[in-house]
Amino acid sequence: ASQLAGDEVYIWGSLVNLKNPWYGRVDYYHQDFANYKPRGYTKPSVVNCFTFLDQHNINNAPLNIFPGSHKEGLLDHLSVFDVNGMHKLVVDPKDLNRAYKKYGHKVIEAEPGDVLYFHSLLIHGSGHNSSPNPRMIILTQVNPKKNKPVESLSKIKEFNLSRAQKEIEQAKLRYEFYKNKYEKQLK
């Protein structure tokens, strides 16, 4: 990872990405750096490492990438709420179309134990798991030690708070919608 990042790195974050059989959430096309920049990072130097724990194939929501798209820099992202009401930043469709024409699209099929490294500007995403098999990845993000956030901690907290407030507002709207729908059914 240090060779890819060009400097000594530290683990910036990690998570388990699980897509349960028959559904699992959709991860719309995005660039990870779109989420890092508002947190004060000025350089898209974070390297993602996906360790595949299950077989990944066309049926169980494999990772989809636009190979080489990281060369485009940070693209325009739209602020949307997914089907679960979670706030997401997604690549503008006009940029997706342009990247598709220039770089193409690749479905990543992998076996358990395979590892994939990719740049935080690479366009990627995945769909629903439409199979009876789970799909799990361990994502480890490494960041060069020199790539420190320039914003103060209070600015980062403000960003996180505003994002959480948007999600709460959306949850309230969904609650009212379904409450009203349920009450109409009772009448």
Labelled PLM ranges:
Residues 2-10, 107-111, 181-187:
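N-terminal auxiliary "cap/dimerization" subdomain that precedes the catalytic jelly-roll/cupin core
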Residues 30-34, 89-102, 134, 153-158:
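Short, surface-exposed loop/helix-turn segments at secondary-structure junctions
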Residues 58-123:
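Double-stranded beta-helix
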Residues 112-117, 121-187:
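Non-heme Fe(II)/2-oxoglutarate
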